[in-house]
């Protein structure tokens, strides 16, 4: 940075440090550089400016330029030569500057300020560069002999640290230059540099007391030693530190012909390559050559020198324990000196590499399309029912894993809920048999809680699309959730009559699976699969239910259902209460169109009860079951299964899924609000807000609306302005007369 110092023999004074980008005015009153007791100094005598472009901030061979401009009456002299008034001149370090004709003499000097930083983050480097730029200094990326300071937040053993210690340069914190800049701006003394020494943060040093100040012993620490490098990367990294310490760095290649006595000569230190380092790429022949040199050293009782010993020898200022081939290796040395630092190499090499192969075998469900998306034949379904409890739970878990794996995974909780729903939809045969659900024999509280959760689970978003929705767009998700709800409600009533269901199951196993398995989604998926691939063999006629027995089975199922409802009245009271709380809104909003259109199958079959509460609960239960059975009956008689094609199976049931959510109907029913007085129009309607000028033309001001403005003359203001002008003219005349009195020209030529 530039400084303006009083010349020898002149009046003593403090040096002026000049910041970059600031104009310093030299004068005798109200200026940056004040010179008093000199009548030849003008008020604005000269201007000093330091210009420092940002582009050359990292170029250590360029220094900022200092220019001076003369604005005085009696002149400014540079090296005893008078400057021309109004022109600028570039100053060099050591130039003598005289302001006026008396003893106001100064000299300018440039104090080098080249800063090198190490282990600083991006924000720290930005703040440091701004402070160095204002101080007129330079920044360097690599350490050179011109560097004056090393900036580190914490001392680590790096190449820059070793070079700074050898060159005797101070290692300081980045906050030092911020405080130095504030002191220059306020014209105070610079801060003490010793109070800005950073702490030592290096595991290789530990808690030992280390003197990091500039010591002369470090400049000749490697004098008389020759460091032999067997790797070019090591030579490039450490050769500068060896050269600064007075030693010689030599790079040896495989082609060089040197006698074996050269490596064992006194003062020769062979730097250990570190073949185990994964960052080094060494060929097989080079490894063989390195092993040959190491064997030579071992035969002579010598050892290779690790990289880190070069830095430790500089820090502790000794070569007896470090960098000594004849000495014992340091046991406390655990790391090598890396390029950036000891700590940074750990993070650079910290790649996770497994030492041994780990058994990562994972058992998942079969993900082939046909076993996952299709179903088993109806004759094989009873074998699946007879799975024990443990295998059944593991099978459910594997199906849940398979569903979650294909899902986009919005959250773990949502995936679990959705996977349970998908498992229930895929294997609905578990829902109607009491032998497949031993969990239903628990207490009533758990049963009601399970029913409440099952109702809630139908409104969770599904994370995986079903193939049957893509193949058959006629089946909607609303129908599926509605059908699943009816099945789950029937599931809650099964512990009352296990013997009835068992006898019913034995009767239906002679021909095919029971009626409940036919109403599951498996049957629907079989029909859709056969429709999709006609070349598949149709099911044998022995497994199909005859048409004449359809009505008999329906009547039998109605009787079984009535027996279950009579035997489970206490449980229904608890279950319907929970059902009423959770599904009251959705059931109340559901249209009654399906129930009115279809013939009810079990209406009026139950006996009347004395309690009004049980009647309401039974009506709600019958309504849900009526819709589910009427849906089955309607789908069974639908035209979709009466296809004339011989390839498709006939006399089967198609499962249709119903939803508790009401679909959007015509808009007229929504716009009408039913009241006691009749239908009223919906009052929650909004109309567009009108904007200015929408209905008529805007009102334009003009013509007679404009009134002319006549300015009146203010005589008092004019008189005051005239008086001020006269006062200013009088003051100017007085100042010119005063300047004429102080004019002195000793070189006036007389005629």
Swiss-Prot record:
Component of the MRN complex, which plays a central role in double-strand break (DSB) repair, DNA recombination, maintenance of telomere integrity and meiosis. The MRN complex is involved in the repair of DNA double-strand breaks (DSBs) via homologous recombination (HR), an error-free mechanism which primarily occurs during S and G2 phases. The complex (1) mediates the end resection of damaged DNA, which generates proper single-stranded DNA, a key initial steps in HR, and is (2) required for the recruitment of other repair factors and efficient activation of ATM and ATR upon DNA damage. GO terms for biological process: blastocyst growth; DNA damage checkpoint signaling; DNA double-strand break processing; DNA strand resection involved in replication fork processing; double-strand break repair; double-strand break repair via alternative nonhomologous end joining; double-strand break repair via homologous recombination; homologous recombination. This is Nibrin. Ubiquitinated at Lys-436 via 'Lys-6'-linked ubiquitin chains by RNF8, promoting NBN recruitment to DNA double-strand breaks (DSBs). Ubiquitinated at Lys-684 and Lys-688 via 'Lys-63'-linked ubiquitin chains by PELI1: ubiquitination takes place following PELI1 phosphorylation and promotes ATM activation and DNA repair. Ubiquitinated at Lys-733 via 'Lys-63'-linked ubiquitin chains by the SCF(SKP2) complex: ubiquitination takes place following SKP2 phosphorylation and promotes ATM activation and DNA repair. Phosphorylated by ATM in response of ionizing radiation, and such phosphorylation is responsible intra-S phase checkpoint control and telomere maintenance. Phosphorylated at Ser-433 by CDK2 in S/G2 phases abolishes interaction with TERF2, enabling DCLRE1B/Apollo recruitment to telomeres. Phosphorylation at Ser-433 in response to dysfunctional telomeres promotes non-homologous end joining repair at telomeres, while dephosphorylation by PPP1CA promotes microhomology-mediated end-joining (MMEJ) repair. Belongs to the Nibrin family. Residues 24-83 form the FHA domain. The modification Phosphoserine is found at residues 343, 347, 398, 433, 508. It is found in: Nucleus; Chromosome; Nucleus, PML body; Chromosome, Telomere. One of its GO terms (cellular component) is chromosome, telomeric region. It comes from Mus musculus (Mouse). There is a cross-link at residues 569, 580 (Glycyl lysine isopeptide (Lys-Gly) (interchain with G-Cter in SUMO2)). One of its GO terms (molecular function) is DNA-binding transcription factor binding. Component of the MRN complex composed of two heterodimers RAD50 and MRE11 associated with a single NBN. The MRN complexes dimerize on DNA to form joined MRN-MRN oligomers required for DNA double-strand break repair. As part of the MRN complex, interacts with MCM9; the interaction recruits the complex to DNA repair sites. Component of the BASC complex, at least composed of BRCA1, MSH2, MSH6, MLH1, ATM, BLM, RAD50, MRE11 and NBN. Interacts with histone H2AX; this requires phosphorylation of H2AX on 'Ser-139' and promotes NBN recruitment to DNA damage sites. Residues 502-518, 528-539, 577-599, 615-636, 731-742 have a biased composition (Basic and acidic residues). Changing residue 433 to D: Mimics phosphorylation; impaired interaction with TERF2. A motif (Nuclear localization signal) lies at residues 461-467. A motif (FxF/Y motif) lies at residues 738-747. The gene is Nbn. Residues 105-181, 224-315 form the BRCT domain. Keywords: Cell cycle, Chromosome, DNA damage, DNA repair, Isopeptide bond, Meiosis, Nucleus, Phosphoprotein, Telomere, Ubl conjugation. The keyword Phosphoprotein applies.
């Amino acid at each position: 940075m530039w400084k303006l110092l009083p010349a020898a023999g002149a009046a003593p004074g403090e040096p002026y440090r000049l910041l970059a980008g600031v104009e310093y005015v030299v004068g005798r009153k109200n200026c940056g550089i004040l010179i008093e007791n000199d009548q030849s100094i003008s008020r604005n005598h000269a201007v000093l400016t330091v210009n420092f472009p940002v582009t050359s901030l990292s170029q250590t061979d360029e220094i900022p330029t200092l220019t001076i401009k003369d604005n005085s009456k009696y002149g400014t002299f540079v090296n005893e030569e008078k400057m021309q008034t109004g022109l600028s001149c570039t100053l060099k370090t050591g130039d003598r500057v005289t302001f006026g004709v008396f003893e106001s003499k100064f000299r300018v000097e440039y104090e080098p300020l080249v800063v090198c930083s190490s282990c600083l983050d991006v924000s720290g480097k930005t703040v440091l560069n701004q402070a160095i730029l204002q101080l007129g200094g330079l920044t360097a990326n690599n350490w050179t002999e011109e560097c004056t300071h090393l900036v580190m937040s914490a001392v680590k053993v790096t190449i820059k640290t070793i070079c700074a210690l050898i060159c005797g340069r101070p290692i300081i914190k980045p906050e030092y230059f911020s405080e130095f800049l504030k002191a220059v701006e306020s014209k105070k003394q610079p801060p003490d540099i010793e109070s800005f020494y950073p702490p030592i943060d290096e595991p290789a040093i530990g808690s030992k007391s280390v003197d990091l100040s500039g010591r002369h012993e470090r400049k000749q620490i490697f004098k008389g030693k020759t460091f032999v490098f067997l790797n070019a990367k090591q030579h490039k990294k450490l050769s500068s530190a060896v050269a600064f310490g007075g030693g010689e760095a030599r790079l040896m290649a495989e082609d060089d012909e040197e006698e074996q006595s050269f490596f064992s000569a006194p003062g020769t230190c062979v730097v250990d390559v570190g073949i185990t380092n994964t960052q080094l790429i060494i060929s097989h022949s080079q490894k063989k050559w390195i092993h040959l040199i190491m064997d030579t050293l071992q035969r002579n009782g010598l050892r290779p020198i690790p990289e880190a010993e070069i830095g430790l020898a500089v820090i502790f200022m000794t070569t007896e324990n470090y960098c000594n081939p004849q000495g014992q290796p340091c046991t406390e040395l655990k790391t090598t000196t890396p390029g950036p630092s000891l700590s940074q190499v750990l993070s650079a090499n910290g790649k996770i590499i497994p030492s041994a192969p780990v058994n990562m075998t994972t058992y998942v469900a079969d993900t082939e399309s046909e076993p996952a998306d299709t179903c088993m034949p109806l004759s094989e379904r009873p074998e699946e029912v007879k799975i024990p409890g443990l295998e059944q739970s593991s099978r459910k878990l594997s199906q849940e894993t398979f569903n979650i794996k294909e899902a986009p995974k919005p959250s773990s909780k949502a995936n679990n809920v959705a996977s349970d729903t998908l498992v229930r939809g895929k294997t609905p045969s578990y829902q109607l048999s009491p032998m497949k659900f031993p969990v239903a024999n628990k207490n009533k509280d758990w049963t009601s809680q399970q029913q409440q959760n099952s109702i809630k689970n139908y409104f969770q978003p599904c994370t995986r699309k079903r193939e049957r929705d893509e193949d058959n767009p006629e089946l909607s998700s609303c129908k599926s959730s509605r059908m699943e709800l009816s099945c789950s409600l029937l599931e809650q009533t099964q512990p009352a009559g296990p013997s009835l269901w068992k006898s019913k199951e034995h009767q239906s196993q002679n021909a095919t699976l029971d009626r409940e398995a036919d109403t599951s989604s498996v049957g629907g998926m079989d029909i859709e699969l056969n429709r999709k691939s006609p070349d598949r063999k149709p099911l044998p006629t022995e497994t199909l239910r005859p048409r004449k027995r359809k009505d008999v089975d329906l009547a039998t199922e109605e009787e079984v259902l009535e027996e279950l409802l009579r035997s489970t009245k206490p449980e229904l009271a608890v279950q319907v209460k929970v059902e009423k709380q959770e599904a009251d809104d959705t059931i109340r909003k559901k249209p009654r169109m399906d129930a009115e259109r279809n013939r009810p199958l079990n209406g009026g079959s139950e006996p009347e009860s004395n309690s009004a509460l049980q009647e309401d609960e039974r009506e709600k239960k019958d309504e849900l079951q009526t819709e589910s059975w009427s849906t089955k009956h309607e789908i069974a008689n639908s035209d979709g299964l009466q296809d004339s094609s011989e390839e498709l199976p006939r006399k089967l049931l198609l499962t249709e899924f119903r939803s508790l959510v009401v679909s959007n109907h015509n808009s007229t029913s929504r716009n009408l609000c039913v009241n006691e007085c009749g239908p009223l129009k919906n009052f929650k309607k909004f109309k567009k807000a009108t904007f200015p000028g929408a209905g008529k033309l805007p009102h334009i001001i003009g013509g007679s609306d404009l009134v002319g403005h006549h300015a009146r003359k203010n005589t008092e203001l004019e008189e005051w302005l005239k008086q001020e002008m006269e006062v200013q003219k009088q003051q100017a005349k007085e100042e010119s007369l005063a300047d004429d009195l102080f004019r002195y020209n000793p070189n006036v030529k007389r005629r």
